[in-house]
């Protein structure tokens, strides 16, 4: 009996960011396969989030041992020099073994010139079966990389992934106005919130009668600044101290690791009347669920704003993106 050659997916999976696993779900729908595997640094967690995976691999050697028919390189912000240096050589080998290579829905970082690529590595990109990025900023950044192949724009197709409501049904009250809150506790965001506290307090006056739904999409394995539980707790303490929390268990990290998935998170967001978010893939969830979204971000970091621009033709009524100034130094 002939063995099925699987599709393998490369991305920043397993690190504790549900936005990346959301991109994996979308990629698996875009490239359906009888057997699909994904790279992950935490296979059990990734497979809980994406149960239709056949399995995970931890390195390029394990990927090549699967003898894939297709390699889908994506997973959100995987378009960086570091990621290319780590994986492009293995894509050359996979292509030589007969695999088709796809670059799908990339978020492109500050790449710089990719002149260090060998001719074979460059051809993997230039001859890819598909090459897409998620927004026009990614196109502009890619144009500076010195590669002749230019990508098409997807406009965050993961916005259309279906929500799962089991957790929302179990945890959230009915008949109560709900505000979802998602804040990343980076030093820059903390400084901006302190500096523009009066602006944020004025913004929060509208929500005095709302219960709070903590929207935690990331508890990173190794980066404390990427812990949304800490960001949410601090924001509620400073700006919404009198509002009840509709589901305090969502701030429990162990519960989060055991129960949250990308689609369950979208189910929580879909039940909110408004989502206040610093994190872009929560904005993507909210926009996809037709929930009013207020983006709040440091003005110097435009990643959230570019998400709003990419999805501007489908923003729910009343949505807006607010940039906060940092203190001058």
Functional labels for PLM-detected ranges:
Residues 1-329:
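Active-site anion-handling motifs in enzyme catalytic cores
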């Amino acid at each position: 009996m002939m063995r099925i050659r699987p599709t393998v997916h490369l991305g920043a999976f397993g690190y504790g960011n549900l936005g990346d696993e959301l991109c994996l779900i979308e990629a698996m729908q875009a490239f359906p396969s009888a057997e699909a595997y994904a790279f992950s640094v935490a296979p059990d967690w990734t497979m809980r989030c994406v149960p239709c995976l056949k399995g995970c691999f931890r390195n390029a050697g394990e990927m090549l041992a699967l003898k894939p028919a297709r390699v889908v390189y994506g997973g959100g912000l995987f378009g960086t020099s570091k990621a290319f240096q780590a994986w492009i050589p293995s894509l050359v080998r996979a292509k030589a073994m007969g695999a088709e290579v796809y670059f799908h829905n990339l978020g492109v970082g500050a790449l710089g010139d990719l002149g260090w690529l060998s001719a074979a590595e460059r051809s993997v990109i230039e001859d890819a079966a598909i090459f897409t990025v998620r927004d026009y900023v990614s196109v502009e950044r890619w144009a500076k990389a010195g590669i002749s192949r230019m990508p098409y724009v997807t406009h965050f197709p993961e916005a259309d992934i279906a929500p799962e409501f089991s957790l929302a049904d179990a945890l959230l009250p009915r008949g109560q106005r709900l505000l979802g809150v998602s804040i990343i506790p980076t030093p820059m965001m903390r400084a901006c919130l302190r500096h523009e506290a009066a602006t944020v307090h004025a913004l929060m006056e509208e929500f005095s009668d709302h219960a709070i739904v903590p929207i935690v999409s990331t508890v990173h394995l190794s980066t404390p600044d990427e812990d949304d539980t800490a960001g949410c707790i601090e924001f509620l303490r400073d700006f919404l101290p009198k509002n009840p929390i509709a589901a305090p268990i969502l701030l429990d990290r162990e519960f989060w690791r055991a129960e949250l998935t990308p689609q369950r998170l979208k189910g929580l967001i879909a039940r909110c009347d408004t989502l206040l978010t610093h994190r872009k893939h929560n904005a993507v969830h909210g926009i996809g669920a037709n929930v009013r979204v207020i983006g709040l971000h440091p003005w110097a970091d435009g990643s959230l704003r570019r998400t709003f621009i990419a999805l501007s033709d489908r923003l729910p009524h009343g949505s807006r993106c607010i940039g906060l100034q940092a203190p001058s130094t």
